[in-house]
From Swiss-Prot:
This is Insertion element iso-IS1n protein InsB. It comes from Shigella dysenteriae. GO terms for molecular function: DNA binding; transposase activity. Coiled coil: none annotated. One of its GO terms (biological process) is DNA transposition. Keywords: DNA recombination, Transposable element, Transposition. Disulfide bonds: none annotated. Transmembrane segments: none annotated. InterPro entries: Transposase_27, Transposase_27_IS1. Absolutely required for transposition of IS1. Belongs to the transposase 27 family. It comes from the Bacteria.
Length: 131
C-alpha cells in the first residue's frame, strides 16, 4: 500500500536569530507520525537529503507547500501543492513549537550549539513522533 506523505520545513535558530537552522521532515498522514527528518539550510540540497531518507518507504504521493525546493526536487507525477494538502503537518509544527521551546519564535529558551540543538529536537521526535 502506498503512503501519502506531507513535507515541510520549520525555522529555528542557534545562538541568535541571525543563525537560522531548519528542521525538514516528512509526516505520515495515516499514522500521524514522522517518517524521516533532517536538519540544514533552506536549500535544494537539504530537500534532496530528506527525499533520500524516504526512499525505503513505498510513498505514492508527496504533498507540500509551494516552496521552490519541493517543486524542483520532488518528481512532478508524485507531487501535490497547496494549503489543503499540508494541514496536518502544519498542525504538527505547532505541536512541536509548543512542546519544544527551542523551536518557539519568541523565547528565551534557545540552543547555543548546533550539535545540542539537533540532538534535543531529534531525540524528542524519535521518542514521541516516530510511528
Amino acid at each position: 500500500m502506498a503512503l501519502i506523505c506531507e513535507l515541510d520545513e520549520q525555522w529555528s535558530f542557534v545562538g541568535s536569530k541571525a543563525r537560522q537552522h531548519w528542521l525538514w521532515y516528512a509526516y505520515n498522514t495515516k499514522t500521524g507520525g514522522v517518517l524521516a527528518y533532517t536538519f540544514g539550510p533552506r536549500t535544494d540540497e537539504t530537500c534532496r537529503e530528506l527525499l533520500a531518507l524516504l526512499t525505503p518507504f513505498n510513498i505514492g504521493m508527496l504533498t507540500s507547500d509551494d516552496w521552490g525546493s519541493y517543486g524542483r526536487e520532488v518528481p512532478k507525477d508524485k507531487h501535490l501543492t497547496g494549503k489543503i494538502f499540508t494541514q496536518r503537518i502544519e498542525r504538527n509544527n505547532l505541536t512541536l513549537r509548543t512542546r519544544i521551546k527551542r523551536l518557539a519564535r519568541k523565547t528565551i529558551c534557545f540552543s547555543r550549539s548546533v550539535e545540542i540543538h539537533e540532538k534535543v529536537i531529534g531525540t524528542f521526535i524519535e521518542k514521541h513522533m516516530f510511528y
